[in-house]
Amino acid sequence: LDSKGTGEPTCYVSYAYEEPYIRDDPNASDPFQLTFRDRTFIHPLYFHQPQDQPYTLSNGYLIEISYAEELLPLESVSLDNVEWRIALPSDTLRQKVRHVEPIGIPFTEEIQDGQRVAVFKLDKLQPDQAGLIGWKATVEMYGLKYFLTPAEVEDAPPLSPDFQAKYLVDDDELAMETDIISGAAAEAAGRETNVLRKMLRIRNYVYDQLSYGIQPKIDTPDVAWERGVASCGEYVGVLLALARLNGIACRTIGRYKCPATPEQKNLPLEPDFNHVWLEFFVPGLGWLPMESNVDDVIDQGPYPKRFFMGLSWYHTEIGKGISFEKMKADNKPEHLSLGDLAINHVRFTILEELNPTP
Protein backbone atom coordinates (compact mmCIF):
# COMPACT_ATOMS: atom_id res chain seq x y z
CA LEU A 1 0.00 0.00 0.00
CA ASP A 2 1.11 3.57 -0.74
CA SER A 3 0.08 4.76 2.72
CA LYS A 4 1.97 8.07 2.60
CA GLY A 5 1.28 9.13 -0.97
CA THR A 6 4.96 9.00 -1.89
CA GLY A 7 4.66 6.46 -4.67
CA GLU A 8 6.66 3.97 -2.61
CA PRO A 9 4.81 0.83 -1.44
CA THR A 10 4.55 0.10 2.28
CA CYS A 11 4.58 -3.48 3.53
CA TYR A 12 2.05 -4.25 6.29
CA VAL A 13 2.52 -7.29 8.51
CA SER A 14 -0.21 -9.00 10.52
CA TYR A 15 0.91 -10.45 13.86
CA ALA A 16 -1.40 -13.03 15.48
CA TYR A 17 -0.75 -14.28 19.00
CA GLU A 18 -2.31 -15.20 22.34
CA GLU A 19 -2.22 -12.62 25.11
CA PRO A 20 -2.39 -13.57 28.81
CA TYR A 21 -4.70 -11.36 30.86
CA ILE A 22 -6.65 -11.25 34.14
CA ARG A 23 -10.34 -11.96 33.50
CA ASP A 24 -12.95 -10.69 35.94
CA ASP A 25 -15.66 -13.39 36.24
CA PRO A 26 -18.43 -12.12 38.57
CA ASN A 27 -20.02 -15.59 38.80
CA ALA A 28 -16.92 -17.33 40.17
CA SER A 29 -16.01 -17.60 43.84
CA ASP A 30 -12.56 -16.35 42.85
CA PRO A 31 -13.48 -13.71 40.23
CA PHE A 32 -9.97 -12.94 38.99
CA GLN A 33 -8.69 -15.65 36.65
CA LEU A 34 -5.58 -15.86 34.48
CA THR A 35 -6.58 -16.77 30.93
CA PHE A 36 -5.68 -16.06 27.30
CA ARG A 37 -7.30 -14.18 24.44
CA ASP A 38 -6.51 -13.91 20.73
CA ARG A 39 -4.88 -10.75 19.51
CA THR A 40 -4.10 -9.54 15.99
CA PHE A 41 -1.86 -6.56 15.34
CA ILE A 42 -1.34 -5.00 11.89
CA HIS A 43 1.58 -2.64 11.45
CA PRO A 44 3.80 -1.30 8.64
CA LEU A 45 7.26 -2.80 8.24
CA TYR A 46 9.93 -0.27 7.31
CA PHE A 47 13.40 -1.34 6.33
CA HIS A 48 16.54 0.13 4.84
CA GLN A 49 19.56 -1.55 3.28
CA PRO A 50 22.57 0.79 3.16
CA GLN A 51 24.24 0.73 -0.23
CA ASP A 52 26.93 -1.94 -0.65
CA GLN A 53 26.44 -3.17 2.93
CA PRO A 54 25.50 -6.78 3.89
CA TYR A 55 22.80 -5.86 6.42
CA THR A 56 19.32 -4.39 6.69
CA LEU A 57 17.84 -2.08 9.32
CA SER A 58 14.14 -2.26 10.22
CA ASN A 59 11.61 -0.46 12.43
CA GLY A 60 13.12 1.32 15.38
CA TYR A 61 12.18 3.44 18.37
CA LEU A 62 13.50 6.47 20.17
CA ILE A 63 13.98 5.30 23.75
CA GLU A 64 14.96 7.00 26.97
CA ILE A 65 17.11 4.70 29.10
CA SER A 66 18.04 5.41 32.69
CA TYR A 67 20.42 3.47 34.91
CA ALA A 68 20.96 4.62 38.48
CA GLU A 69 22.58 3.20 41.60
CA GLU A 70 20.82 4.22 44.81
CA LEU A 71 23.42 4.38 47.58
CA LEU A 72 22.14 2.13 50.37
CA PRO A 73 25.08 0.33 52.02
CA LEU A 74 24.49 -2.98 53.77
CA GLU A 75 27.66 -2.57 55.82
CA SER A 76 29.01 0.29 57.89
CA VAL A 77 32.05 1.03 55.77
CA SER A 78 33.86 4.24 54.82
CA LEU A 79 35.66 4.43 51.48
CA ASP A 80 38.22 7.00 50.34
CA ASN A 81 38.92 8.24 46.79
CA VAL A 82 36.08 6.30 45.21
CA GLU A 83 35.98 5.86 41.43
CA TRP A 84 32.72 4.37 40.14
CA ARG A 85 32.62 3.49 36.43
CA ILE A 86 29.42 2.69 34.52
CA ALA A 87 29.45 1.99 30.78
CA LEU A 88 27.25 4.14 28.55
CA PRO A 89 25.12 2.99 25.59
CA SER A 90 27.22 2.25 22.51
CA ASP A 91 27.00 3.80 19.06
CA THR A 92 26.62 0.92 16.59
CA LEU A 93 25.14 0.21 13.17
CA ARG A 94 21.69 -0.17 14.73
CA GLN A 95 21.96 2.06 17.79
CA LYS A 96 22.61 5.82 17.88
CA VAL A 97 23.03 7.79 21.10
CA ARG A 98 21.43 11.23 20.85
CA HIS A 99 21.97 12.55 24.36
CA VAL A 100 23.43 11.52 27.73
CA GLU A 101 23.16 13.29 31.08
CA PRO A 102 23.95 12.38 34.71
CA ILE A 103 21.47 11.23 37.32
CA GLY A 104 22.54 12.55 40.71
CA ILE A 105 26.30 12.98 40.99
CA PRO A 106 27.95 14.52 37.87
CA PHE A 107 30.37 12.38 35.87
CA THR A 108 33.21 12.79 33.45
CA GLU A 109 33.30 10.72 30.29
CA GLU A 110 36.19 8.49 29.23
CA ILE A 111 36.78 6.24 26.22
CA GLN A 112 37.78 2.66 27.07
CA ASP A 113 38.54 0.33 24.14
CA GLY A 114 36.39 2.53 21.93
CA GLN A 115 33.44 2.53 24.36
CA ARG A 116 32.05 5.47 26.32
CA VAL A 117 32.21 5.19 30.11
CA ALA A 118 30.74 7.49 32.78
CA VAL A 119 33.27 7.99 35.60
CA PHE A 120 31.98 9.19 38.98
CA LYS A 121 34.50 10.30 41.61
CA LEU A 122 33.87 10.83 45.31
CA ASP A 123 36.47 11.92 47.86
CA LYS A 124 34.73 9.85 50.52
CA LEU A 125 31.76 7.49 50.73
CA GLN A 126 30.29 7.39 54.23
CA PRO A 127 28.18 4.55 55.74
CA ASP A 128 25.07 6.75 56.03
CA GLN A 129 25.57 8.65 52.79
CA ALA A 130 22.58 8.83 50.45
CA GLY A 131 22.58 9.71 46.78
CA LEU A 132 22.25 8.54 43.20
CA ILE A 133 24.97 7.56 40.75
CA GLY A 134 23.87 7.00 37.18
CA TRP A 135 22.95 8.32 33.76
CA LYS A 136 19.99 8.93 31.46
CA ALA A 137 20.35 8.53 27.70
CA THR A 138 18.14 9.08 24.67
CA VAL A 139 18.91 6.41 22.09
CA GLU A 140 17.69 5.39 18.64
CA MET A 141 17.37 1.59 18.49
CA TYR A 142 16.59 -0.36 15.28
CA GLY A 143 16.27 -3.96 14.21
CA LEU A 144 19.29 -5.36 12.33
CA LYS A 145 19.83 -8.47 10.23
CA TYR A 146 22.85 -9.53 8.19
CA PHE A 147 22.20 -11.55 5.03
CA LEU A 148 25.64 -13.06 4.49
CA THR A 149 26.13 -16.54 3.05
CA PRO A 150 28.97 -18.93 3.91
CA ALA A 151 30.32 -18.57 0.37
CA GLU A 152 30.89 -14.85 0.94
CA VAL A 153 33.29 -15.50 3.83
CA GLU A 154 34.99 -18.61 2.44
CA ASP A 155 38.22 -16.70 1.83
CA ALA A 156 38.25 -14.74 5.09
CA PRO A 157 41.82 -13.98 6.22
CA PRO A 158 43.17 -15.44 9.49
CA LEU A 159 42.76 -13.61 12.78
CA SER A 160 45.47 -11.11 13.62
CA PRO A 161 47.85 -12.01 16.48
CA ASP A 162 46.27 -9.26 18.61
CA PHE A 163 42.79 -10.71 18.15
CA GLN A 164 44.03 -14.21 18.88
CA ALA A 165 45.63 -13.03 22.12
CA LYS A 166 42.52 -11.13 23.20
CA TYR A 167 39.57 -13.19 21.97
CA LEU A 168 40.73 -16.82 21.82
CA VAL A 169 41.77 -17.13 25.47
CA ASP A 170 40.01 -18.05 28.69
CA ASP A 171 39.72 -14.64 30.35
CA ASP A 172 36.47 -15.15 32.27
CA GLU A 173 36.37 -18.58 33.94
CA LEU A 174 35.23 -20.32 30.75
CA ALA A 175 36.64 -23.74 31.80
CA MET A 176 38.24 -24.12 28.36
CA GLU A 177 40.93 -26.42 29.76
CA THR A 178 38.45 -28.97 31.15
CA ASP A 179 37.91 -32.28 29.35
CA ILE A 180 34.14 -31.84 29.17
CA ILE A 181 34.36 -28.45 27.41
CA SER A 182 37.29 -29.29 25.11
CA GLY A 183 35.51 -32.48 24.09
CA ALA A 184 32.28 -30.60 23.42
CA ALA A 185 34.18 -28.06 21.31
CA ALA A 186 35.67 -30.78 19.11
CA GLU A 187 32.32 -32.50 18.64
CA ALA A 188 30.43 -29.26 18.03
CA ALA A 189 32.46 -28.02 15.06
CA GLY A 190 33.50 -31.33 13.53
CA ARG A 191 35.68 -30.71 10.48
CA GLU A 192 33.95 -27.48 9.45
CA THR A 193 36.30 -24.65 8.46
CA ASN A 194 33.93 -21.94 7.20
CA VAL A 195 33.43 -19.44 10.04
CA LEU A 196 29.68 -18.94 9.47
CA ARG A 197 28.85 -22.62 9.13
CA LYS A 198 31.12 -23.44 12.07
CA MET A 199 29.49 -20.84 14.34
CA LEU A 200 26.02 -22.07 13.37
CA ARG A 201 27.04 -25.68 14.02
CA ILE A 202 28.34 -24.73 17.46
CA ARG A 203 25.15 -22.80 18.26
CA ASN A 204 22.87 -25.65 17.19
CA TYR A 205 24.98 -28.20 19.06
CA VAL A 206 24.71 -26.14 22.25
CA TYR A 207 20.95 -25.82 21.72
CA ASP A 208 20.72 -29.62 21.38
CA GLN A 209 22.46 -30.13 24.72
CA LEU A 210 21.06 -27.29 26.86
CA SER A 211 17.63 -26.11 27.96
CA TYR A 212 16.88 -22.64 29.26
CA GLY A 213 16.34 -22.07 32.97
CA ILE A 214 17.17 -19.24 35.36
CA GLN A 215 19.74 -20.15 37.99
CA PRO A 216 20.47 -18.46 41.35
CA LYS A 217 24.00 -17.71 40.12
CA ILE A 218 26.03 -18.05 36.92
CA ASP A 219 28.07 -21.25 36.93
CA THR A 220 31.10 -21.99 34.79
CA PRO A 221 30.50 -23.66 31.40
CA ASP A 222 31.56 -27.12 32.57
CA VAL A 223 29.02 -27.07 35.42
CA ALA A 224 26.22 -25.73 33.20
CA TRP A 225 27.05 -28.28 30.48
CA GLU A 226 26.90 -31.20 32.89
CA ARG A 227 23.64 -29.92 34.39
CA GLY A 228 22.01 -29.45 30.96
CA VAL A 229 20.04 -26.38 32.05
CA ALA A 230 21.45 -22.87 31.67
CA SER A 231 20.55 -19.20 31.96
CA CYS A 232 21.33 -16.73 29.16
CA GLY A 233 24.66 -15.89 30.82
CA GLU A 234 25.57 -19.57 31.04
CA TYR A 235 24.60 -20.11 27.38
CA VAL A 236 26.98 -17.26 26.53
CA GLY A 237 29.77 -18.81 28.61
CA VAL A 238 29.40 -22.16 26.85
CA LEU A 239 29.20 -20.55 23.40
CA LEU A 240 32.27 -18.40 24.10
CA ALA A 241 34.29 -21.40 25.27
CA LEU A 242 33.36 -23.64 22.34
CA ALA A 243 33.80 -20.90 19.74
CA ARG A 244 37.18 -19.77 21.07
CA LEU A 245 38.47 -23.33 21.22
CA ASN A 246 37.52 -23.57 17.55
CA GLY A 247 39.42 -20.41 16.60
CA ILE A 248 36.44 -18.03 16.40
CA ALA A 249 37.00 -14.69 18.11
CA CYS A 250 33.96 -13.73 20.18
CA ARG A 251 32.94 -11.50 23.08
CA THR A 252 30.03 -10.90 25.45
CA ILE A 253 27.51 -8.14 24.65
CA GLY A 254 24.56 -6.84 26.67
CA ARG A 255 23.18 -5.50 29.03
CA TYR A 256 19.41 -5.23 28.89
CA LYS A 257 16.38 -5.68 26.67
CA CYS A 258 13.77 -2.93 26.60
CA PRO A 259 10.33 -4.44 27.37
CA ALA A 260 8.89 -5.21 23.92
CA THR A 261 5.67 -3.24 24.36
CA PRO A 262 5.97 -0.40 21.84
CA GLU A 263 2.29 0.45 22.24
CA GLN A 264 3.07 1.65 25.78
CA LYS A 265 4.67 4.96 24.89
CA ASN A 266 5.77 7.58 27.41
CA LEU A 267 5.42 5.16 30.32
CA PRO A 268 8.35 3.99 32.48
CA LEU A 269 9.01 0.30 31.74
CA GLU A 270 11.17 -1.99 33.85
CA PRO A 271 12.96 -5.06 32.43
CA ASP A 272 12.46 -8.30 34.37
CA PHE A 273 16.12 -9.32 34.06
CA ASN A 274 19.39 -8.21 32.60
CA HIS A 275 20.42 -10.04 29.44
CA VAL A 276 23.58 -10.93 27.53
CA TRP A 277 24.34 -12.30 24.08
CA LEU A 278 27.54 -12.42 22.03
CA GLU A 279 29.30 -11.19 18.93
CA PHE A 280 31.65 -13.24 16.79
CA PHE A 281 34.28 -11.83 14.47
CA VAL A 282 34.70 -12.49 10.76
CA PRO A 283 38.08 -11.18 9.55
CA GLY A 284 37.68 -8.66 6.77
CA LEU A 285 34.05 -8.03 7.72
CA GLY A 286 33.74 -7.27 11.44
CA TRP A 287 31.66 -8.26 14.46
CA LEU A 288 28.36 -10.08 13.92
CA PRO A 289 25.69 -10.46 16.63
CA MET A 290 24.22 -13.75 17.84
CA GLU A 291 21.66 -14.27 20.59
CA SER A 292 22.49 -16.58 23.46
CA ASN A 293 19.42 -18.79 23.90
CA VAL A 294 16.39 -17.04 22.38
CA ASP A 295 16.32 -19.22 19.23
CA ASP A 296 16.47 -22.42 21.32
CA VAL A 297 12.70 -22.90 21.03
CA ILE A 298 12.29 -26.41 19.55
CA ASP A 299 13.55 -29.53 21.29
CA GLN A 300 16.40 -30.92 19.13
CA GLY A 301 15.63 -28.40 16.36
CA PRO A 302 15.41 -27.32 13.65
CA TYR A 303 16.23 -23.96 15.17
CA PRO A 304 15.24 -20.61 13.64
CA LYS A 305 17.91 -18.11 12.62
CA ARG A 306 16.06 -14.99 13.75
CA PHE A 307 18.94 -13.86 15.94
CA PHE A 308 21.84 -15.48 14.12
CA MET A 309 23.56 -12.37 12.74
CA GLY A 310 20.59 -10.29 13.87
CA LEU A 311 19.12 -8.29 16.74
CA SER A 312 15.70 -6.83 17.40
CA TRP A 313 15.04 -3.18 18.18
CA TYR A 314 14.79 -3.83 21.92
CA HIS A 315 18.35 -5.13 22.40
CA THR A 316 20.31 -2.47 24.29
CA GLU A 317 24.05 -2.49 23.57
CA ILE A 318 26.02 -1.02 26.47
CA GLY A 319 29.80 -1.11 26.84
CA LYS A 320 30.66 -3.59 24.08
CA GLY A 321 33.60 -5.77 25.06
CA ILE A 322 34.23 -4.06 28.41
CA SER A 323 32.92 -4.43 31.97
CA PHE A 324 29.55 -2.77 32.47
CA GLU A 325 30.24 -1.46 35.96
CA LYS A 326 33.21 -1.30 38.32
CA MET A 327 34.13 0.49 41.52
CA LYS A 328 37.47 0.98 43.23
CA ALA A 329 38.63 2.86 46.33
CA ASP A 330 41.86 3.24 48.28
CA ASN A 331 40.62 1.16 51.21
CA LYS A 332 37.98 -1.06 49.57
CA PRO A 333 37.67 -4.41 51.41
CA GLU A 334 38.26 -7.37 49.10
CA HIS A 335 34.88 -8.93 49.88
CA LEU A 336 32.87 -5.74 49.24
CA SER A 337 30.73 -5.84 46.08
CA LEU A 338 28.63 -3.22 44.31
CA GLY A 339 25.49 -4.92 45.58
CA ASP A 340 26.66 -4.28 49.14
CA LEU A 341 26.71 -0.54 48.51
CA ALA A 342 23.76 0.27 46.26
CA ILE A 343 20.55 -0.89 44.60
CA ASN A 344 20.33 -0.44 40.83
CA HIS A 345 17.25 0.94 39.08
CA VAL A 346 16.73 0.46 35.32
CA ARG A 347 13.95 2.12 33.36
CA PHE A 348 13.04 2.38 29.68
CA THR A 349 10.60 4.88 28.18
CA ILE A 350 9.56 4.40 24.55
CA LEU A 351 9.12 7.89 23.09
CA GLU A 352 8.31 7.40 19.40
CA GLU A 353 8.63 5.02 16.47
CA LEU A 354 11.40 5.63 13.94
CA ASN A 355 11.76 4.78 10.27
CA PRO A 356 15.31 3.62 9.43
CA THR A 357 15.12 5.04 5.91
CA PRO A 358 17.35 8.13 5.72
Residue spans of the language-model regions?
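Alpha-helical and coiled-coil interaction segments, frequently adjacent to or embedded
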Residues: 2-41, 307-358
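A short, structured loop/turn motif at beta-sheet edges
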Residues: 77, 125-131, 193, 244-246, ...
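A mature extracytoplasmic/lumenal domain signature
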Residues: 88-90, 137-139, 152, 254-256, ...
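Acidic low-complexity segments
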Residues: 110-115, 119, 126-226
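Active-site nucleophilic cysteine motif
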Residues: 198-202, 228-243
